[in-house]
């Protein structure tokens, strides 16, 4: 008998009616859970607040150091959200224990978001404890829910819990440390968390999780990921509206408003017009749903979300200082955000259809080349150029897809 079998035998000593005590917390087989539930949507509101906190922190002081810290926070926020989404994909979110879990995670999430702007100052420990509480408590709940369910899934969550417990020690130790060491320890914590799925949460003595152990609903994960993109775009709209109102008397604000709104709409179009549905179809139809979902959503959506957040910060700069000559610091957000976004959507479309969207390659190339113009043009011109380049990408892809469909017909 393998070591893993011994662990399973120890954790499943009883059969019969007791199995029903916890397995009814799980999503029922053959149940259509494609649509996000109301408890999940309610949970997402915490991340609206968290993204606003992050965006405003960046807008207040966009130095290279602050930008690096923001990248760390984007990795952390995305990881805690996508892990929660995976767990909710397996559980029945309409029953009370699972709803109570979501409400508990919401509370920890609010505390985490409150601490976020000062996480590298006086609130590091609060941020670390709240983040770790979300990760570990959710994983322990899933472990308990699967205790009388599928043994392979139970062991997968046993491994995940072990990995998240290790990463939490780095988070909390970092929260107790001085800022320079805190950065290092929190980076180590994120490396641990992001490495886990790639090595299938290998644990000494019991090894790695078998492939495709979790009975996930790929279409549900696709919708949830798309909703997070909507959250990020919504935060962008809030930023545009707030800072347009704050700068109404500044000459050039109406033009920057138009180009900022155009940029945001085009990001929506590039993601949703074709790519999101293709990703959902791929996740639903593949013979390897768990692996495909990791490529498309767990890792693939991170640059999409990060790109939208940085684009919002760049739009804020352009609205606040439309006629100021560009700087490379600001351009990291103004041009780097759309580059990240296009890279992420290109990856998603490549994985889901095995066709490389050359329009995205062209757009990334133009945006990268635009860095050479930064010191010579004003912020509003950089914003306008970004909007025009994304428009070219969107029109190119639209025409190319229309041609492909005609050819296929």
Curated annotation (Swiss-Prot):
Keyword DNA repair assigned to the entry: answer is no
Protein origin, superkingdom: Bacteria
Which Pfam families would you find in this protein's record?
Answer: LtrA
Q: Which GO terms describe its cellular component?
A: plasma membrane
TM segments? 62-82, 100-120, 123-143, 152-172, 183-203, 252-272, 293-313, 328-348, 355-375, 376-396
Q: What does the record say about its membrane topology?
A: Multi-pass membrane protein
UniProt-annotated location(s)? Cell membrane
Question: Do you know which InterPro entries this protein is assigned to?
Answer: Low_temperature_requirement_A
Key words, A-Z: Cell membrane, Membrane, Plasmid, Transmembrane, Transmembrane helix
Q: What is its main location?
A: membrane
The UniProt entry, under PANTHER family, shows: BLL5714 PROTEIN
Q: What is this protein called?
A: Uncharacterized protein RA0937
> What is the protein's species of origin?
Rhizobium meliloti (strain 1021)
